[in-house]
Amino acid sequence: MSLAQDINRVVAPFEVISEFKPAGDQPAAIADLTERINNGEKDVVLLGATGTGKSATTAWLIEQVQRPTLVMVQNKTLAAQLANEFRELLPNNAVEYFVSYYDYYQPEAYVAQTDTFIEKDSSINEEVERLRHSATNALLTRRDVVVVATVSCIYGLGTPEEYIAGMVTLRKGAEMNRDDLLRKFVSMQYARNDMDFHRGTFRVRGDTVEIIPMYEELAIRIEFFGDEIENIQTLHPLTGQIIQDEEEMYVFPASHYVAGPERMSRAIKRIEDELAERLQVLESQNKLVEAQRLRMRTTYDLEMMQQMGFCNGIENYSSHIDGRARGTAPHCLLDYFPDDFLLVIDESHVTVPQIGAMYEGDMSRKRNLVDFGFRLPSAMDNRPLKWDEFLERVGQTVYLSATPGKYELGKADGFVQQIIRPTGLIDPEVVVKPTKGQIDDLLGEIRTRTERNERVLVTTLTKRMAEDLTDYLLGHGVKVEYLHSDVDTLRRVELLRELRMGTFDVLVGINLLREGLDLPEVSLVSILDADKEGFLRSSTSLIQTIGRAARNVSGQVHMYADRITDSMAQAIDETNRRRAIQVAYNTEHGIDPQPLRKKIADITDQLAKEDADTDALLGSFDYGKGKRGITGANKPGAKKAAAQVRADGLAAAPAEDLVGMIAQLTEQMHGAAAELQFEVAARIRDEVSELKKELRQMQAAGHA
């Protein structure tokens, strides 16, 4: 059996495919960035004004330097947005998405003041877990890879060496015993399930083995003739349709945290030694309660690891399992990249401080757990990278921001500037107004904008102020909503879409109206209390907020203030500097600024239409006993029927089974949308459409 041997990496060129060509400042920025990277500059800053196409510039830069790239972003929503943009620009290359797979995560903690221990509680998103596996799989099997990741990529991940050692290579014509392969799959943490075939499982029928790797949506079929692999194929797990024949494939483990029996037994011995050492320390300090607590918890974990190979909170023993020395850095996604990878930090003024803060935030919680006997000291080695450890693991770095921070500007030799927008749009005019009568003035400005079918953003300092202002504007007949951290994530996406569509005209917010919001319909951004110095009214925050009006031809920013603070002056001066450059460029080249037209395509709207069509179709389907529609489709047996559809393909599926499948996929579709996995939801929607077409054909033929 061929295991952790040489992996034949696919080497394909990065190629941007787009109807657009670099325009405005982009050609000069791409050339300058490429020259700096090729000359070996370690830190490069791209100061790119909002809306100048920094993402596209990055894609063209990757095409020029032809190196695997990690793009670090400040949050999941922007990561998804950026990954989609790169997938459109680099359709023939692997663009991966790597974020935390927790939908919900409550870390374990101990509050000494109230003697309260909080158990770890979490919920894992399976689709995000698949995408994480897809990212590591791509990094190990090809070079043309762009991974868009949040800061969670500096948290511990299993070692690449163990991950590769656990891999199995399937090669057509190779000698391999079927039973040995099945045992190997089990050791890789895949589960055999002949009835419910899904990601992370395999099934066996005679000499045919099928598996859906953790990182794939397609299944792999391996056909044996004796002890020889006769055929390898990829197929659609739902329909059974063969996608293509394969000569060679790699199957990686179902978990990044794979440890063989030898490694696990070594780890258990090390944990036992540390426990004995720590108990001695606690007892010498007369901390008998803490010693007893630690003995009970650790002994239980050790028994679970010996019997099951796993225990809750096993990540706290990761340094022992990895065989790392005390205090050494954990392995993480960065270790899966080749040595020459390029790092791009998006919105660096926010993301760089995030990276630096991760370690201390994690340590403050863990110290309490160790001091009070809930964890061994080695639990503190299950952590994100420290800032200096992060720097050791990265090579050349490009920082992207409209407002670069002092750190990146201090590291770089000057900066590359991208001020001109391809559309010719210029930065908005900034007007400072007195706070006296600011709400009445705001109301008048809103009415002027709504008459022109334009939208308004209003930014306040507190949630209370946002809600009170929303109530006041509603009372004066304004169509308005508010947006702050208490509004759930999916609702935020819906609010932004509804604002663009004109469902309402004004959106009131606090700190969410900054990086990454792309709203071409917004012609006015009003900043209340602009002279209140602080994080929300720093020069960086003000420039970012001003940028929200930079996508509209008639964009304006109104700052309500009784004095001009240093932050306001810096923001206004920088905006005026950029305006002057943009106006001069447009005049010289005879460019008339064009409105930015961006399609309002939102999956939530498409799902609503799909639901209406599904209800209309299934409403005509009789289940007996008066049950019609999608509720009937959820009756007992629907899932079993759905599994049968998967196994036998559509042609063999009776109408009732198809209906069950439609209902099940509809539920999955909404689940994916709720997790902001819009691409997944769209793919499931397409499957639902195909199944409904099949059902309609059966009805037309009189078979349903």
Swiss-Prot record:
> What are the Helicase ATP-binding domain coordinates in residue numbering?
35-188
Under PANTHER family, the record lists: UVRABC SYSTEM PROTEIN B
The record's annotation in CDD domains points to: DEXHc_UvrB (cd17916), SF2_C_UvrB (cd18790)
List the HAMAP family.
Answer: UvrB
What keyword terms does UniProt attach to this protein? ATP-binding, Cytoplasm, DNA damage, DNA excision, DNA repair, Excision nuclease, Helicase, Hydrolase, Nucleotide-binding, SOS response
Q: What is its main location?
A: cytoplasm
* GO terms of molecular function: ATP binding; ATP hydrolysis activity; DNA binding; excinuclease ABC activity; helicase activity
Record SUPFAM superfamilies: C-terminal UvrC-binding domain of UvrB, P-loop containing nucleoside triphosphate hydrolases
Instruction: Tell me the residue numbers annotated for binding ATP.
Output: 48-55
Pfam families found in the cross-reference section? Helicase_C, ResIII, UVR, UvrB, UvrB_inter
GO CC field = cytoplasm; excinuclease repair complex
Instruction: Give the UniProt record's GO annotations in the biological process aspect.
Output: nucleotide-excision repair; SOS response
Cite the UVR domain residue spans from the record.
Answer: 659-694
The record places domain Helicase C-terminal at 438-604
- Return the domain comment text from this UniProt entry: The beta-hairpin motif is involved in DNA binding.
Spell out the subunit comment.
Answer: Forms a heterotetramer with UvrA during the search for lesions. Interacts with UvrC in an incision complex.
* Motif Beta-hairpin, residue numbers: 101-124
Q: Where does the UniProt annotation locate this protein?
A: Cytoplasm
Free-text function comment from the UniProt entry: The UvrABC repair system catalyzes the recognition and processing of DNA lesions. A damage recognition complex composed of 2 UvrA and 2 UvrB subunits scans DNA for abnormalities. Upon binding of the UvrA(2)B(2) complex to a putative damaged site, the DNA wraps around one UvrB monomer. DNA wrap is dependent on ATP binding by UvrB and probably causes local melting of the DNA helix, facilitating insertion of UvrB beta-hairpin between the DNA strands. Then UvrB probes one DNA strand for the presence of a lesion.
Organism ancestry:
Bacteria, Bacillati, Actinomycetota, Actinomycetes, Micrococcales
Show the InterPro entries listed in the entry. Answer: Helicase/UvrB_N, Helicase_ATP-bd, Helicase_C-like, P-loop_NTPase, UVR_dom, UVR_dom_sf, UvrB, UvrB_inter
UniProt name for this protein: UvrABC system protein B
The family assignment reads: Belongs to the UvrB family.
